[in-house]
Amino acid sequence: MKFAFFTNIISPHQMPLARALVELLGADEYRYVYTEAEEKGRADLGWGNEGEDWCLHGDENTAVLNEADVLMSGVRAPNLFEKRAKEGKTTFYCSERWFKPPIGFLRVFVPSYFKMARRIVKLLNENENFYYLPMGIHAARDMARLCGLMNGDWKCLFRAPKLDFERKPGGKVFSEGVKECGSVGVGECVGKMRMWGYFVQSSEFRVGSLELNHGIHRIHGRKECGHEGVKVLWVGRLLKIKRVDTIIKAVGECSKSKKITLDIYGVGPEEGKLKKIAAKYGDVVKFHPPVPINEVRKLMREHDVYVLSSNGYEGWGAVVSEALEEGMAVIGTYEAGSSATILPESNLFHAGDWRKLKELLEGDVERVGIGPWTAKSAAEFLTGLTRLTGLGNGY
């Protein structure tokens, strides 16, 4: 079975799945096609993997994308999708949410955007071999809203439907009993969706069967880390959408009644503002330079809690999976794709609500394992679902 993946960059959040597929299918049957070279700053931190023989630089006209028995694409390429549909070939289109703030749903009123979205919805409605893989429940709701609107349900101009879903890669999405947006076109649309995300490298230091390690876990210093108190970690670019100020305030206020510290690794335009906020709390918050990707996991093993504080701009947030792999307690926002999809509601707070985050840090947090959200599980789902397409002779 010839399988191709089409994306914009070579990402460390996509390569684990790529390698899992190569292991299952063989290198001769798999191609990873990317459109852009990685920017130098990210390349220096470990992004990029052009050395793999199955990685190709190209565009939507690259021959292997149409030759593949199965294509998974993170690029919106309706011309390619329609061509493959006419030839009866299986295509999975995956994306983060369609209507990120602040523009949000207003994007649908841009003529070119509306036309592109209508073509995608038409493929979902009319082609049995075209599927949508939403990167999180917010992306699924956005697509369901589009489907309802394109099928004449004008209520979808004002709200997105609430959906239920199976919490696993390839999990089904359900719209039964949903009243929002009526039912015109929504049920048919979600029947062609399967839950998706980014899948990270499995931890080499996972102890026992962490996948089964569920239950209430009071946040405290991990003895194996060799420190007292609670160490909170945040890693990334210091951007406004990341809402790192929320963590600083929550940890700072917590520090008045318990031993807790916050380590921030990264730089960005918000750095000066964040340091001013942190200065109010003495040495509770420490800032560090960015570190390469392969060192982030080591930091996670030295800390107790990871907080994903991003607002709705965060389409996914693969760091949630990385932290779970390393056995950390993880708290995230309702607005970010990964936390809303993977974490239990007891571990969630709304972006910017530092008081709720403080409450979570002071109380009990459900410590969960990565569960089925692994590259191996995702690869097995894809190959199992598409096995009937037949086997090719390689590229």
Show where each model-derived region lies.
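A charged, aromatic-enriched C-terminal amphipathic alpha-helix characteristic of glycosyltransferases
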Residues: 362-395
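Nucleotide-activated donor-binding/catalytic signature segment of Leloir-type glycosyltransferases, i.e.
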Residues: 275-291
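Membrane-proximal helix-turn-helix segments that form the acceptor-binding/catalytic region
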Residues: 110-132, 141, 145, 177
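Conserved donor-binding/catalytic core segment of Leloir-type glycosyltransferases
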Residues: 133, 194, 198, 227-242, ...
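Short alpha-helical donor nucleotide-sugar binding micro-motif in glycosyltransferases
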Residues: 290, 298-303
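Short alpha-helical segment that forms part of, or immediately flanks, the ligand-binding pocket
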Residues: 297, 320-325, 339-340
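Conserved acidic donor-binding segment of nucleotide-sugar-dependent glycosyltransferases
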Residues: 344-355, 362-365
